[in-house]
């Protein structure tokens, strides 16, 4: 029997010039690995190098080495991390595979060039450049025409294939498109971004199917899938008995937590949306309806392009079970399965180490970080005492909490 541990972690907040989160993040991951004690451990990373990747990508090999040192039980490491930010196909994705010596003789790695499995020899291999042509990895950035209206980003996927005790595993790291604007979900098509995520993941699944090489692998897709809540049902839940008020561009307001009260005399409201609504509206406010003049403009929720300010953000986090049903994007992928989610949203957590147990007021809470699998994999995992959870709740891991799935086969 082999104990497996799969982790996905968006590490975009980890890479800053001061590297202040490195030590706590490494300890948080190492503690989870120690508690599970797997023989085969894979961690998928997104946004390696962070937002300041030209400055901070040099930190990536350092943190890989430090994590490896913190996991002395593993004798073999295969690390594939795309930090070649000057390359056209740059994705900032990473896959780190740690294997115990006791499993070496029962593990082989697929060579996508020769289409053959090869035994593992060298104990440590770290590759950070030239992954497009590296034989043990498939890495692609999503085609530019997937989203022609915005700047071509670094979203894409990375695949490794392994044979472990005669079972074939495909581990796929995917980073799907995010929600560019909170307002677009109200002004335009509420499924605007989820439809593009579906297109991207369907593309990945089709590519994987074409490269199965005569087998049906146990497929695990785990990464920052950027799944978001159904905006209509979630907003209806939060804003019951409120009225929606678009706010003109020049209107500037602070946080609702600071006691925001909108003044009817100073507020310019567009009551008849038109063709130029996106251009003229900077925010949408949901205000309580009341017969009292003092409270009729009381703001429950204010939404801007990159702001989601609920009047009681702590309650929003504490009551996460009340909106679990609004997490529906997995329904778009009938061939993929997931263990039951019983953990809080994984995004957007505070990036401040002094205030790490709160959500930022940038986006609606969401379960962005997921582990999906095909039916064959799901059937085996179900019988293997699975545990599916997020972790790092007491420490700052950046704006995403890592998610893990452990099981035995």
UniProtKB/Swiss-Prot annotation:
Similarity comment: Belongs to the inositol 1,4,5-trisphosphate 5-phosphatase type I family.
A GO MF label: inositol-polyphosphate 5-phosphatase activity
Q: What is its EC number?
A: 3.1.3.56
Q: Give the protein name, as stated in the record.
A: Probable type I inositol 1,4,5-trisphosphate 5-phosphatase
Q: Name one GO biological process term.
A: negative regulation of epidermal growth factor receptor signaling pathway
Which SUPFAM superfamilies does this UniProt record tie to the protein?
A: DNase I-like
Q: Pfam families annotated for this entry? A: Exo_endo_phos2
Q: Which organism is it from?
A: Caenorhabditis elegans
């Amino acid at each position: 029997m082999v104990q497996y541990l799969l982790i996905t972690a968006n590490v975009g907040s980890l890479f800053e010039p001061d590297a202040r989160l490195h030590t706590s993040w490494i300890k948080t991951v190492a503690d989870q690995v120690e508690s599970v004690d797997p023989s085969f451990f894979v961690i998928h990373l997104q946004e390696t190098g962070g937002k300041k990747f030209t400055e901070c990508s040099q930190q990536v090999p350092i943190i890989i080495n430090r994590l490896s040192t913190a996991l002395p039980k593993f004798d073999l490491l295969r690390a594939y991390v795309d930090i070649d930010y000057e390359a056209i196909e740059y994705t900032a994705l990473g896959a780190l595979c740690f294997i115990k010596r006791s499993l070496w003789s029962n593990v082989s790695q697929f060579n996508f060039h020769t289409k053959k499995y090869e035994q593992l020899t060298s104990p440590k291999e770290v590759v950070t450049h030239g992954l497009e042509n590296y034989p043990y990895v498939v890495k692609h950035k999503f085609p530019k025409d997937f989203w022609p209206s915005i700047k071509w980003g670094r979203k894409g996927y990375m695949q490794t294939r392994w044979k472990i005790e005669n079972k074939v595993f495909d581990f796929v790291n995917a980073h799907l498109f995010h929600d560019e604007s909170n307002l677009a979900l109200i002004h335009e098509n509420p499924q605007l971004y989820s439809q593009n995520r579906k297109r991207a993941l369907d593309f990945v699944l089709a590519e994987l199917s074409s490269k199965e090489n005569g087998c049906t692998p146990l497929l695990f897709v785990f990464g920052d899938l950027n799944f978001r809540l159904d905006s209509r049902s979630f907003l209806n839940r939060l804003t019951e008995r409120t009225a929606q008020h678009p706010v003109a561009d020049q209107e500037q307001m602070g946080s609702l937590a600071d006691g925001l009260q909108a003044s009817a005399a100073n507020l310019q409201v567009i009551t008849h949306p038109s063709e130029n609504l996106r251009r003229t509206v900077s925010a949408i406010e949901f205000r309580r309806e009341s017969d009292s003049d003092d409270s009729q403009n009381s703001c429950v929720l204010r939404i801007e392009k990159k702001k989601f300010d609920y009047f009681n953000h702590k309650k929003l986090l504490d009551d996460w079970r009340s909106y679990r049903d609004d997490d529906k994007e997995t329904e778009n992928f009938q061939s993929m399965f997931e263990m039951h989610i019983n953990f809080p949203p994984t995004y957007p957590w505070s990036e401040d180490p002094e205030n790490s147990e709160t959500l930022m007021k940038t986006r609606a809470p969401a379960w962005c970080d997921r582990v999906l699998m095909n039916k064959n994999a799901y059937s085996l995992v179900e019988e293997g005492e699975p545990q599916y959870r997020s972790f790092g709740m007491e420490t700052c891991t950046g704006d995403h909490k890592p998610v893990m799935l452990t099981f035995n086969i």
